[in-house]
Amino acid sequence: MPALPIDQEFDCERFRADIRATAAAIGAPIAHRLTDTVLEAFRDNFAQGATLWKTTSQPGDQLSYRFFSRLKMDTVSRAIDAGLLDAAHPTLAVVDAWSSLYGGAPVQSGDFDAGRGMAKTWLYFGGLRPAEDILTVPALPASVQARLKDFLALGLAHVRFAAVDWRHHSANVYFRGKGPLDTVQFARIHALSGSTPPAAHVVEEVLAYMPEDYCVAITLDLHSGDIERVCFYALKVPKNALPRIPTRIARFLEVAPSHDVEECNVIGWSFGRSGDYVKAERSYTGNMAEILAGWNCFFHGEEGRDHDLRALHQHTESTMGGAR
């Protein structure tokens, strides 16, 4: 990546001031010593990656931040060495297994809560990957592996990202679905969450913001295999084109500073038995849009058609047709 202008680089002191002000503005907790530990442990990742803010519409929820890494690094070991993660955590084996796939190609990034420290380890698998590869690693219990058939039945056969939530012992698995997403497919995917179907106007809005081939994240309990949530994402939504958003999200997008080359706002509609809410992310430094574009993510206003995905679907359909 070319050198960024000085005002767009990650600066630890400026970040400390910005995180204090943003947390105060949205009523989120903050632990300053934990923040210092994170910044020291992952200094290179913040300096060379892209940093973003995150929160949800839930009152008092955490102000979170993430680096999308440009460095190939074992961030889990670094978190353990810094005292941010327990070396005996029961889900370490899952991250190890996923990180070793495809000759060790997956890239690890880190999510942190301002008030609690290490939150998630995020993995980009290097492109479209068969869901079978991701969801049948031996480190996953049979209850989780058994979910594969449910996803394949919905046409969710390819995964691009996953994130392990250390605190909740769960994982978000990010599928790219062949679209366009319609009300029938939305309802089928939403039913996995077990939550009450949303109002028609909510569904209409979600569909209006989805690219043709869409991203849906499914949250799995890593012990029971229960599906806890489903979330649909819209990326790089300009402020003048935002959907209807809750007051807390509007406040967050107003006050969270972005020193990035391009402003990149992400909206997620999350549905689950414990309640529905809206997520938001906002670029901070490091050219978040460049990283996401390099990972073939689709932005608001783009056609969003994944030709590789469609070729894979066509091959699968022709193979199944020939087997009849």
Swiss-Prot record:
Pfam families with a match to the protein in the record: PTase_Orf2
Annotated effect of mutating residue 54 to S: Abolishes prenyltransferase activity
One GO-annotated biological process of the protein: antibiotic biosynthetic process
Gene Ontology molecular function terms on file: prenyltransferase activity; transferase activity, transferring alkyl or aryl (other than methyl) groups
The organism's place on the tree of life at top rank: Bacteria
Positions contributing to substrate binding: 160, 281
Catalytic activity: 3-(4-hydroxyphenyl)pyruvate + dimethylallyl diphosphate = 3-dimethylallyl-4-hydroxyphenylpyruvate + diphosphate
Phenotype for residue 215 to A/S: Does not affect prenyltransferase activity
Assigned keywords, A-Z: Antibiotic biosynthesis, Prenyltransferase, Transferase
EC identifiers of the protein: 2.5.1.111
Disruption phenotype: Cells lacking this gene produce antibiotic compounds (vanillobiocin, isovanillobiocin and declovanillobiocin) with a methoxy instead of the dimethylallyl group at the position 3 of the 4-hydroxybenzoic acid moiety of clorobiocin.
Pathway info: Antibiotic biosynthesis
InterPro entries: Aro_prenylTrfase (IPR033964), Prenyltransferase_CloQ (IPR020965), PrenylTrfase-like_sf (IPR036239)
Subunit structure: Monomer.
Record function comment: Magnesium-independent aromatic prenyltransferase that catalyzes the irreversible transfer of a dimethylallyl group to 4-hydroxyphenylpyruvate to produce the ring A structure in the clorobiocin biosynthesis pathway. Clorobiocin is an aminocoumarin family antibiotic.
Family as reported in the entry's similarity comment: Belongs to the aromatic prenyltransferase family.
Protein name stated in the entry: 4-hydroxyphenylpyruvate 3-dimethylallyltransferase
Organism per entry: Streptomyces roseochromogenus subsp. oscitans
Higher taxonomy: Bacteria, Bacillati, Actinomycetota, Actinomycetes, Kitasatosporales
